């Protein structure tokens, strides 16, 4: 799928907020065109461009954020691609069975600071997992969502001209072996887990719809600047 195809996507209905928000359910998309599409969307948006949330999966890929160090890739027996990208954070893995939600938002219109958006994304995941009877929590100084100290969701953002892109990744039924070949998010020995480990049978699409409702509930409304 090309970057242009990602941008076309499948648009859902606008959310019931003052600032228009479109939801795109993209299925499985290669990382590079998705990243290119996020950059293009953010660079070309205007004051009245609708915000968007993209729900998708990626084929196996490691991404290395701006704070990442190549030595955190310990081994790569499977030949998984490594892509150096512009989000915050360090190294992580994306692959089938992992829900990815990209939040392309004008933070100024929604009166959101970056740290507030991070906390909002974490809370949306925590509330989503609570629907499955799971108690998840934050960890000071280590963005993401954890259950008993093991990481189930990773976060990373880039903000350009007051607008965010990238977002979060939640392990649903992903193969966790590739996490064992890195120091996830730069932390040696950090355990990663998935919803499947707790008997959750929902697939990525079903979990995505639950998470989406919590994101929409928590996002503050905003106003498109009048002309």
Swiss-Prot record:
The pathway is: Protein modification; protein lipoylation via endogenous pathway; protein N(6)-(lipoyl)lysine from octanoyl-[acyl-carrier-protein]: step 1/2
Q: Where does substrate bind?
A: 87-94, 154-156, 167-169
Catalytic residues of the enzyme: 185 (acyl-thioester intermediate)
Question: Location of site Lowers pKa of active site Cys?
Answer: 151
Q: Please state the protein's primary subcellular location.
A: cytoplasm
The protein's annotated catalytic reaction(s) are: octanoyl-[ACP] + L-lysyl-[protein] = N(6)-octanoyl-L-lysyl-[protein] + holo-[ACP] + H(+)
What Gene Ontology terms for biological process does this UniProt record contain? protein modification process
User: Which keywords accompany this UniProt record?
Assistant: Acyltransferase, Cytoplasm, Transferase
Which InterPro entries is this protein grouped with?
aa-tRNA-synth_II/BPL/LPL, BPL_LPL_catalytic, Octanoyltransferase, Octanoyltransferase_CS
Compartment(s) of residence: Cytoplasm
A Pfam family of the record is LplA-B_cat
Name the SUPFAM superfamilies on file. Class II aaRS and biotin synthetases (SSF55681)
Please explain the role this protein plays, according to its UniProt record.
Catalyzes the transfer of endogenously produced octanoic acid from octanoyl-acyl-carrier-protein onto the lipoyl domains of lipoate-dependent enzymes. Lipoyl-ACP can also act as a substrate although octanoyl-ACP is likely to be the physiological substrate.
Family assignment from sequence similarity: Belongs to the LipB family.
What is this protein identified as?
Answer: Octanoyltransferase
* Organism field: Azoarcus sp. (strain BH72)
Q: What's the encoding gene here?
A: lipB
């Amino acid at each position: 799928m090309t970057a242009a195809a990602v941008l076309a996507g499948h648009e859902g209905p606008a959310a019931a907020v003052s600032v228009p928000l479109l939801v795109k359910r993209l299925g499985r998309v290669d990382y590079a065109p998705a990243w290119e599409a996020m950059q293009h969307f953010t660079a070309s948006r205007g004051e009245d461009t609708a915000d968007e949330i993209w729900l998708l999966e990626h084929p196996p890929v490691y991404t290395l954020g701006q704070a990442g160090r190549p030595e955190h890739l310990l081994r790569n027996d499977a030949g998984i691609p490594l892509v150096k990208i512009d989000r915050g954070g360090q190294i992580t893995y994306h692959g089938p069975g992992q829900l990815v939600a990209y939040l392309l938002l004008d933070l100024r219109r929604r009166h959101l600071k970056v740290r507030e958006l991070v906390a909002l994304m974490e809370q949306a995941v925590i509330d989503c997992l609570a629907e499955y009877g799971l108690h998840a929590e934050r960890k000071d100084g280590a963005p993401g969502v954890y259950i008993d100290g093991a990481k189930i969701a990773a976060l990373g953002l880039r903000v350009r001209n007051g607008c965010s892109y990238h977002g979060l990744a939640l392990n649903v039924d992903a193969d966790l072996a590739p996490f064992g070949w890195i120091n996830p998010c730069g932390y040696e020995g950090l355990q990663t887990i998935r919803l499947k480990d707790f008997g959750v049978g929902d697939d990525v699409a079903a979990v995505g719809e639950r998470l989406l409702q919590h994101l929409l509930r928590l996002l503050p409304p905003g106003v498109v600047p009048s002309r």
